[in-house]
Structure formats: C-alpha cells, structure tokens
C-alpha cells in the first residue's frame, strides 16, 4: 500500500523559550511572523504544554506547513541551563581551566543526565553522565565525586 502524501513542510524553526512564558514579543513574534504562523495560537499552545516547566529554558522545534498550520516538539532544557541551576550560578566561567564558576555533585550530574537522556545521543545513563560532565568542565563548573 502507498503512503498518502501529508502536508508539505515549508519551514522548520528552532527557538529557546522560557517554559509557560512565551509571548508575541521578540524572539517568538518575529520568527513566527516571518513564517506566517498564527502567533497567538502558538503562544497559547506552547504555554499550555510547558506550564509545568515554568521558568526553565525550553528548546522547541516548530514545523510550519504550507497551509500555515504548525506542529511543535518541546525538548529538555539545555545541559548548560540545568548545570547553572544546580550550581547556583548566573553564568559559566570566562576562563574554565583557570577559575571555577561553581560546583555540582556527582548525584546532581546523574540527575541532569537522566533528565537529558531523551535528547542525548547516549546508550545509557553512564554515557550521558560523561557528556554532562564535559559540558560542566567547559563551563568551569567542577564536578565533585
């Protein structure tokens, strides 16, 4: 049996928006406006979908179709965002090898790895932990064993 043709994809957008706090102001409005998407509808749907992750930075992939309809997929927050939250710092170190920006425990790194598992290219949690530790190292955040 042949597969029916779906709607034609016109554009794919990737944005990072705080959970439950999307609004038509930049960067959301202009990006969606250029793609001719109903901005109000996206904002409402996104805020409903991310209400439980209020304040977290949520990467979202928006697929726009030729009839101006859209679908979106939310991802897990960036590892850097989760590490900064766990370490209680505003930003990573300007010179990661010289000065430490903060500290996180191995347990915190494992928790972040479990959260990020769906979006990481890792076979198991141990591999995911190594990826997160590498991100922490590049930000100047020390991982304590």
UniProtKB/Swiss-Prot annotation:
UniProt superkingdom: Bacteria
Keyword Amino-acid biosynthesis: no
Entry GO CC: cytosolic large ribosomal subunit
GO terms of biological process kind: translation
Gene3D superfamilies: Ribosomal protein L11, C-terminal domain, Ribosomal protein L11/L12, N-terminal domain
Post-translational modification as stated in the protein's UniProt record: One or more lysine residues are methylated.
Xref: InterPro entries: Ribosomal_uL11, Ribosomal_uL11_bac-typ, Ribosomal_uL11_C, Ribosomal_uL11_C_sf, Ribosomal_uL11_CS, Ribosomal_uL11_N, Ribosomal_uL11_N_sf
Keywords: Methylation, Ribonucleoprotein, Ribosomal protein, RNA-binding, rRNA-binding
Record-linked PROSITE patterns: RIBOSOMAL_L11
Gene Ontology molecular function terms on file: large ribosomal subunit rRNA binding; structural constituent of ribosome
Record's keyword annotation contains rRNA-binding: yes
Role of this protein: Forms part of the ribosomal stalk which helps the ribosome interact with GTP-bound translation factors.
Family named by the database record: Belongs to the universal ribosomal protein uL11 family.
Quaternary structure (record): Part of the ribosomal stalk of the 50S ribosomal subunit. Interacts with L10 and the large rRNA to form the base of the stalk. L10 forms an elongated spine to which L12 dimers bind in a sequential fashion forming a multimeric L10(L12)X complex.
Name of the protein: Large ribosomal subunit protein uL11
Native source organism of the sequence: Rubrobacter xylanophilus (strain DSM 9941 / JCM 11954 / NBRC 16129 / PRD-1)
């Amino acid at each position: 049996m042949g597969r029916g043709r779906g709607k034609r994809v016109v554009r794919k957008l990737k944005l990072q928006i705080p959970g439950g706090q999307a609004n038509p102001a930049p960067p959301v409005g202009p990006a969606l406006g250029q793609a001719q998407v109903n901005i109000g509808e996206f904002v409402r749907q996104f805020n409903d979908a991310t209400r439980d992750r209020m304040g977290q930075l949520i990467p979202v992939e928006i697929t726009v179709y030729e009839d101006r309809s859209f679908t979106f997929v939310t991802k897990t927050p960036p590892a850097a965002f989760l590490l900064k939250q766990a370490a209680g710092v505003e930003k990573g170190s300007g010179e990661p090898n010289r000065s430490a920006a903060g500290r996180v425990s191995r347990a915190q790194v494992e928790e972040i790895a479990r959260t990020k598992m769906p979006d990481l290219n890792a076979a198991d949690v141990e591999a995911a932990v190594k990826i997160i530790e590498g991100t922490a190292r590049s930000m100047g955040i020390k991982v304590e064993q």
